[in-house]
Amino acid sequence: MPAVKRKAPPTLGAKLNRRVRPRFEAEPDSDVEEGSSDEAPSEEEGGGFHTGSDTEEEEDEEVEEGSDDESDAPSEHGGAGIDAAQLSFGALAKAQASLGTLKKKKKGSKGGDDESDDDEEKEEPNWKTEIEKGLKSKVEKHHRTSKHAPVEMTSKKPVSRRREFLVTNDAPAKPKARDPRFAPPGLGGSISGGSKAVVDEIKARKAYSFLDDYQEDEMKQLRMAIKKTKDAHEKEELQRALLSMESKKKARVRKDKERELLSEHKKKEKELIKQGKTPFYLKKSEQKKQLLVEQFASMKKSQVDKAIERKRKKIAGKEKKALPFARRTAEDR
């Protein structure tokens, strides 16, 4: 028997793009059909079967050839020859899904090309635009967002290109500008000290003297809370807060006394200078002595004795710490 070549099954694309041809069956005349059936039923049956099989094979070949041609056609002409009215809804849905994936792939390839072009453009520096930007940034002035907003100033100050290679002691020192936000409160931004700093501190102390009354009230409330509370941990915290407030108050009072002492001494010296005498400036040690004299003058005898004993113990402890340790001898071993 001769070997029969089997055709390969059509692919999914060929099935989807296959052209379906409708079969038009003409309505046969009843008289002709009856006559033909009576005359030669066996011949028509045999011939009809043979001719039908031949026609079916020819149609299959045509369909396969058409499917092959049409499968190649969409790639070349974009699928213009397909009639959508002759396809089923399932075939159309599958075709639409396959077209969507193709479009995405094409877009991705285009996007990659664009990105590569952008990278190439970025790599090539445009010197003119950079120079123009630098000039614009220099020309641009700081402006306010609204008329009520504060003026915006840059914190970046350029360093001077001039170098002072010859510095003499006779030349006056230039005042260094400092940010007033980082200055101690009450000094008005002058960190270096001097008369201005002292004056500003005195003014601030006078302006905020009403805070002493508030602090006294807070200390009274803390004492009352310490008496009422039974929790040991909370009591310790309140006592610590009260102790810190009392120590701050003592330091403030001591500073006020020092300031009063200096102001009185300056007044006396000014009067003596007017009389033609030379001025006398108090040293730090003299200031401390006068402060101790005034402090003991306002205290009772028992309080003075206690203060002296406390001071003596403090000095003795410092002296003991300053002494070197005794060396070990053979007897100590």
UniProtKB/Swiss-Prot annotation:
Record GO biological process: maturation of SSU-rRNA from tricistronic rRNA transcript (SSU-rRNA, 5.8S rRNA, LSU-rRNA)
Biased composition (Acidic residues): 27-46, 54-73, 114-123
This protein's record includes keyword Ribonucleoprotein: yes
Record-linked InterPro entries: RRP36 (IPR009292)
Domain of life: Eukaryota
Biased composition (Basic and acidic residues): 124-138, 316-333
Record keywords, A-Z: Coiled coil, Nucleus, Ribonucleoprotein, Ribosome biogenesis, rRNA processing
Compartments (UniProt record): Nucleus, Nucleolus
Pfam family, one: RRP36
GO cellular component entries: 90S preribosome; nucleolus
Residue ranges that the Swiss-Prot or TrEMBL entry lists as coiled coil: 215-275
UniProt region (Disordered), positions on chain: 1-85, 99-194, 242-262, 313-333
General function of this protein: Component of the 90S pre-ribosome involved in the maturation of rRNAs. Required for early cleavages of the pre-RNAs in the 40S ribosomal subunit maturation pathway.
PANTHER family named among the record's database cross-references: RIBOSOMAL RNA PROCESSING PROTEIN 36 HOMOLOG
Family: Belongs to the RRP36 family.
Subunit-level organization: Associates with 90S and pre-40S pre-ribosomal particles.
Protein name: rRNA biogenesis protein RRP36
Gene that encodes it: RRP36
